[in-house]
Amino acid sequence: MSLNIQNLTLNLGKKTILNNVSLHVKDGERVGLVGSSGSGKSMLLRAATGLLPFETKISGSCMLGGVQTVGASDENLARIRGKYVGVVFQQANRALNPMLSVEEQISLPLRIHYQLDADDVHNRVCAMLEKVGLPQNIISKRTFELSGGQLQRVGIATALITSPRLILADEPTTALDSVTQKDVVNMLTSLVDNMGASMLFVTHDFSVLSRAAKRCYVLDSGRLVDSAEVQDLLENPRVTSTKQLVDAAKKLTLRAQKLDSQNVSSENVTSENVTSESASSENVSSENASRKDSSLLTAKNIHVTLGRALARAEVLKGVDLDLFKGESLAIIGGSGSGKTTLIRAMLGLQKISDGIVTYDSQIVNSSTNRKKISDYSALRKETSLVFQHPFAALDPRWTVLKSVAEPLNIWRKSLQLDDATICNRVEEMLQLVGLNPKDFLERYPHELSGGQAQCVAIARALINNPRVLLADEPMSAIDVAERTRILDAFAAIRKERPTMSCIFVSHDLGMIQHLATRVIVLNDGKIVEFGRVSDVLNSPQNDYTRALVNAAIM
């Protein structure tokens, strides 16, 4: 099915979201749409399928095959959506219904558009799970039991279950590690090609785009400013906004210049061929031994087991970690490797089945006797956490001002802060992360793009001047141009507060080379490699680390 958009203009209140946009996707063609956060990419997809806010004013033409969607009734659009047009949404954790099992979620379009018996539906869901690389044993699980990569695959399966003729993919690899990104893009493009369908692939990541499409449009502030073959845009960007995106992508992407280790494909990497032997490093071990007295946050032999009695899984398997004063430490690993569980355990937010966590020499998490745990107030007051999914972390009823000010309001009595001081601090933090306070103070989360919401979450985490900052995928929803600005902000903060310790959980290897000095690689709940960032990225010793590095090379 073709997509033909002509002179599409979209206004939300007094703001123009899309301005005279025209693009086309031929039948059976894969086309990319790239642009910075807030450029209007997601709104373009919503306009194409009629999923716009009630107060939106739209003009122009959008043809899905031979059907005009601009001005079409909800009844007519409902016949198209899910049957002929499949949408892969940006954040699967928000797009999927937490009340439904995986089978119920994937089968929903089938049950809406076709009259099928239960056995036929079940068989089709099982076949689709196999196509997207998911095990059959997750069929009865719900969204909160799945990793980020699994959630995205479920979202793709839901979009493709009816074999639609057009796929609209909105940032389908956001917040996924490099290996999973590569696998998801390869899987999605293969399925689309096998179905003979068309696809419009929306992203801010040129390294992902080069695998997903051959031709590309560039959107900037609601206007189409460039279009060409993807390779041409990468090699010879003609427009300023395109050049900025390409330059930022190259800066934040690993290059193949120093990687002389053998090539290991992600398909050959399993937990069986990953051992902990590669985690030994005499240089780092001796250096750490001399710094034990400056350790601020320590985890010893951490084990975490999750799930019900008949389906329990060990998520962390004896992890040791030291965060030193003033240090920036990165934790990398594939989706489901245990990264988020580890930092939650270190903050006392996750019950551990074995081990001990100390903060400033005080026990804050223990498996043996929870009565021995010290007062949490120091830990909670002096640490901040940037959550992986900003929209899930922001209260939809609160303005940006109230959300960012929340940590100060909690401790305002001890900090002796009045409303005016708090408001000034909020404005300072918003400016630091690149958001104009005048434009954003009174906005609500649903009025923010993914990147803008992530910036708000980072501002909230930094506002109370924490001793320890733990950031779980802090830039997963931010385009490459915005990432450079956030990196500059982090650099300025570290220069201003040299004693602040940071843990950055990330799947983006290009980012951690700018954020951290030391790195830990997690796979299947175990540390498989650690050392200085430059050493690990340039000369990975473990098969799993090599796969992550090779998948991230642009």
Task: Go through the PLM ranges and name each one.
Residues 49, 347:
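Helix-to-loop junction immediately C-terminal to a conserved catalytic motif
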Residues 209-211, 512-514:
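A short, surface-exposed alpha-helical micro-motif characterized by mixed small hydrophobic
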Residues 161-165, 463-467:
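A short, proline-enriched helix->beta-strand linker immediately N-terminal to the Walker B motif
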Residues 142-146, 150, 444-448, 452:
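Conserved ABC ATPase signature
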Residues 57-68, 355-367, 379:
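Conserved ABC transporter NBD signature motif
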Residues 224-228, 530-531:
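ABC ATPase "signature
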Residues 69-86, 104, 112, 232-237, ...:
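ABC ATPase NBD coupling module
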